Amino acid sequence: MTQLLIIFAAAAAGLFFFEDVRDVLKLWDIRDMRIIWYGVSIAVIVILADMAVMKWFPSHLYDDGGINKKIFSKRSIPHIIFLTLLIAFAEEMLFRGVLQTHIGLWTASLIFAALHFRYLSKWLLFIMVTAISFLLGLMYEWTGNLFVPMTAHFIIDAVFACQIRFEHVRRDKHDEHVESREKKSPESL
């Protein structure tokens, strides 16, 4: 639902900021190889940095209150892919394509971070989302192509959403195995 509101906001702001639909279409170039070089490379760097944070910092500093687990833990992989594509498209269109193009990198990045309001009370998460937003904005500045930050955004979200899903499945299988062993054990008779 939120992503549909973001798409609507991007369309409404786009009508205000852009003179013509062709101006919006100029922001996208699927043939640009920097989609791979920058988009994939930056996504891998962000994923590795996030994994390092999870390894070296206490979990209460990067815990989002379980919201992402609630969203992704029981979804199928195709549904996760669809949702993360929608999220990446909607957010990059609004924050990079419309806002950054017209009000600048810093302002768009700060608005992006602030709208991830569930992170405002967690200083580490807020720093991370602000840094990632700025990095996505820099990729757009460097390339002028929305596919580049959208690709990175999609990969980052999809990897972590799938990780949440796989952890949920693994935990369920472990719990089933433990329950099965408890039923078979002589103490339970």
Curated annotation (Swiss-Prot):
<keyword id="KW-0472">Membrane</keyword>
<dbReference type="Pfam" id="PF02517">
    <property type="entry name" value="Rce1-like"/>
</dbReference>
<dbReference type="GO" id="GO:0080120">
    <property type="term" value="P:CAAX-box protein maturation"/>
</dbReference>
<keyword id="KW-0812">Transmembrane</keyword>
<dbReference type="GO" id="GO:0004175">
    <property type="term" value="F:endopeptidase activity"/>
</dbReference>
<keyword id="KW-1133">Transmembrane helix</keyword>
<keyword id="KW-1003">Cell membrane</keyword>
<feature type="transmembrane region" description="Helical">
    <location>
        <begin position="123"/>
        <end position="143"/>
    </location>
</feature>
<dbReference type="GO" id="GO:0005886">
    <property type="term" value="C:plasma membrane"/>
</dbReference>
<feature type="transmembrane region" description="Helical">
    <location>
        <begin position="144"/>
        <end position="164"/>
    </location>
</feature>
<dbReference type="InterPro" id="IPR003675">
    <property type="entry name" value="Rce1/LyrA-like_dom"/>
</dbReference>
<feature type="transmembrane region" description="Helical">
    <location>
        <begin position="35"/>
        <end position="55"/>
    </location>
</feature>
<feature type="transmembrane region" description="Helical">
    <location>
        <begin position="97"/>
        <end position="117"/>
    </location>
</feature>
<protein>
    <recommendedName>
        <fullName>Uncharacterized protein YpbD</fullName>
    </recommendedName>
</protein>
